[in-house]
């Protein structure tokens, strides 16, 4: 694999469009938006959600992984029906595994494309789903 990468990608540089985009990209603005969204999710869902990781001072999360203890796949489906996409990042491996994380993890997207109104909607819909029979 490394040999193939070295043979096919050596000496390639970034294209002009990407260089211009990256130099004009406001990294701090996006980091702040992500942290603000993630902290909002943690604050509003702290009573009803099991978070996999705490938010650390330097984190810039793309998503907040939570554990859904009731039928995660049904909750996931209902979120999609409400036009809220939450990826499942750790799907079942082919091998036998004793961890139930593969059946319970759901990622709440909180990147810079979203604002607090979007986060509030995620919280509202998810809260209703977790307290009803899915």
Model-predicted segments: where are they?
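PLP-dependent aminotransferase class I/II
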Residues: 1-134
């Amino acid at each position: 694999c490394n040999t193939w990468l070295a043979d096919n990608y050596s000496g390639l540089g970034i294209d002009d469009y990407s260089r211009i985009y990256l130099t004009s990209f406001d990294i701090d603005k996006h980091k702040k938006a992500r942290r603000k969204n993630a902290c909002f999710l943690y604050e509003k869902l702290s009573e009803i959600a099991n978070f996999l990781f705490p938010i650390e001072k330097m984190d810039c999360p793309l998503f907040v992984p939570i554990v859904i203890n009731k039928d995660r796949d049904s909750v996931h489906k209902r979120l999609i029906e409400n036009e809220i996409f939450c990826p499942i990042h750790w799907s079942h491996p082919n091998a036998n595994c004793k961890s139930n994380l593969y059946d319970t993890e759901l990622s709440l997207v909180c990147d810079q494309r979203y604002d607090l109104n979007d986060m509030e909607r995620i919280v509202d819909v998810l809260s209703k789903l977790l307290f009803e029979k899915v």
